[in-house]
Amino acid sequence: AIGTRPVNFHLDALKKLGAKIVLKNGYIEASAKKLIGTNINFEGITVTGTENIMMAATLAEGRTIIKNAAKEPEIIDLANMLVSMGAKINGAGNDTIIIDGVNNWTGTEFDIPADRIEAGTYLTAATVTKGEIKIEGINPERLMKVIEKLKTAGATISYTSSSISLNMKREYPNPVNITTAPFPDFPTDMQA
């Protein structure tokens, strides 16, 4: 496990939008007749909290401004999908996101980008097993800190705009110090 993942940021922000939150027998019940846009200032960076509020705010009445928003690529991906469904979102990928509520979403087709944590896990597995791997359909810009650390460990890595190739010829990887932090730094979920 990665550790506790409190949901208070999510719940507090949903309450600010007008949701009624009830904690009952270990479950969270959220309801709202109508959500109203507001200013949300997250006390700490939360990827899923940012995503949850983005989705809720797109259907809220008025404008919602999210400050101290997460900047991970998944935030941009979600914003792009929601915009393709009719949402009005500006600033995804920055620490301030502005959302103007709409009445409804429409259907869409959207290509889901490769999971950078999954790709990083396979690259790491190849590094520690003296392996060789090529991952296609992944944007290496989303994994630059992971690539940097795996090179320090001794892996030979090359990449294009949509693939990463790794070859570990060393018998044992070099030791590597890792400090996790929000994107673009080394992802917390890669430490598990």
Give a label for each model feature.
Residues 1-192:
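Structural preference for solvent-exposed beta-strand-turn elements
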